[in-house]
Amino acid sequence: MTGNYKQETAPTRLTEAKGTSLAREIFTSNFWMSGLAIVKYIPRSFRVKQVDGMAFYTDAKHDEFRNRVFQTTPANPRQWGTMSVAQMLHHLNLACGGSRGFYTLPDESYFVSRTVFRWILVDWFPEQPVGLRLPKGFKIPHTAQFDFDFEKQQLLKILDATWQARSAADWGPHPMFGPMTVKEWGKLLQIHIDYHLRQFAA
């Protein structure tokens, strides 16, 4: 199982990933696959309406995401990718809950990821491109098994915790993008959660 579950919801510090740098990452397949996904998405980014990050903190958006998660079952049909429903839920738990203290994740950030990648993937793009492979701490091994009911209830808890995080002090740094504003967190979570729920027709 990826990540260590912790019950508290206060922000946690990222563990240091020694040697993480652009020079190191540029030789990995994950870096190039993610770069290809970004380039392929650019034309669509000009046609899709931008996402208001602060909408994440509204009652309407909170209820929408909770209802979509609540209605998800192990039988939901996969639309793309290779993850199972339980693996997808665990992936979202890591991605959404790490910076609220539910998990301890490695710091994989470097200058380019905290500036250029953050601007492209958070501030510019209105959707998550298909095929991103970063950060590695969010990746789920194909053979990993997770308890569907636990992961579902965990995600509902994390949705509540993130919805209540209304100041920058409530958030720890993102493993790839570093410290972010409340609005940036709201936008990133909206597009990431929506992407993976649509992945399973939820």
Write out the residue ranges for each language-model feature.
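N-terminal export leaders
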Residues: 16-17, 23-32, 38
